[in-house]
Regions:
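Class I (Rossmann-like) S-adenosyl-L-methionine-dependent methyltransferase catalytic domain
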Residues: 1-97, 114-118, 122, 132-183
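Short acidic/polar active-site loop segments enriched in Thr and Asp
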Residues: 100
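A conserved beta-strand element that flanks and buttresses the S-adenosyl-L-methionine
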Residues: 103-104
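Hydrophobic adenine-recognition pocket in adenosine-nucleotide-binding enzymes
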Residues: 107
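Helix-to-beta-strand junctions that scaffold the AdoMet/dcAdoMet cofactor pocket
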Residues: 112, 127-129
Length: 183
C-alpha cells in the first residue's frame, strides 16, 4: 500500500468522506489550539479534508491557508470554505517560517514513520518561533493498511519519541479522545 493508494481512496470516496466529517464538532480541540494563538493569526490547515476546521478558524477571525493531498478533497473543501485549497502532497510541501499555528487533524497519520519525521521537520521550519502545532493520530502501535488506507498509529511514548527525533518541539498538552469516526 502506498500513499498513492491512500489518495486514490480519498479521491474515490470524496462525497461520503466529506459528508461524514463536515459536521463533526471538534470544539474542545479547536479551543485548545486557538487559545494559544493571537486573534487574526495565520493558520495552516495541513490536510484539511472537508474544510470543516478551515471554515471554523475563518469564522473565528483567523487567517487560514489550507492544503490537502487529495485533489478531489481540495475541490470539495474549496467549495465549502470559499477559499482556494492548495493541492499538495505532504512529503513535497515546504514553507519558510510564516505560520503562527499549523493544524494537522487526522492527516499526517497516513504517512510512514520516515516520512512523518521529514514532514514534521518541515512543519517545524514553517512555524514562527511560537511553534503551535496540533496533530492527531489513532491510538496504538499499528503501522500499515487498514480499511483501504495507510495508517501510522501512535501512543504517548511513540509520539514523544518521534517528536524528540525531529527536535525543535515541546509537547505542551496531550490527551486521548475516542474517535469521532468509526474508520
Amino acid at each position: 500500500m502506498t500513499s498513492t493508494d491512500t489518495l486514490l481512496y480519498y479521491n474515490t470516496n470524496t462525497f461520503s468522506f466529506v459528508e461524514s466529517t463536515q459536521s463533526v464538532q471538534m470544539t474542545d480541540a479547536w479551543n485548545r489550539f486557538t487559545s494559544k494563538l493571537a486573534s487574526s493569526s495565520l493558520i495552516l490547515d495541513f490536510g484539511c479534508v472537508s474544510g470543516r476546521d478551515t471554515k471554523y478558524f475563518l469564522e473565528h477571525g483567523f487567517k487560514v491557508e489550507a492544503i490537502d493531498g487529495s485533489e478531489e478533497l481540495c475541490k470539495a473543501a474549496s467549495k465549502f470554505t470559499e477559499i482556494v485549497v492548495k493541492h499538495q502532497l505532504f512529503q513535497d510541501w515546504k514553507s519558510d517560517s510564516k505560520y503562527n499555528g499549523i493544524w494537522a487533524c487526522s492527516s499526517i497519520l497516513h504517512l510512514n514513520k520516515t516520512d512523518l519525521k521529514q514532514v514534521i521537520g518541515n512543519i517545524r521550519d514553517a512555524l514562527l518561533p511560537s511553534r503551535i502545532f496540533y496533530t492527531s493520530f489513532k491510538y496504538g502501535n499499528f503501522e500499515g493498511v487498514r480499511n483501504g488506507r495507510y495508517f501510522t498509529d501512535l501512543t504517548e511514548s511513540s509520539f514523544a519519541e518521534l517528536i524528540n527525533e525531529v527536535t525543535g518541539f515541546e509537547i505542551i498538552e496531550e490527551w486521548i479522545t475516542s474517535d469521532v469516526r468509526t474508520s
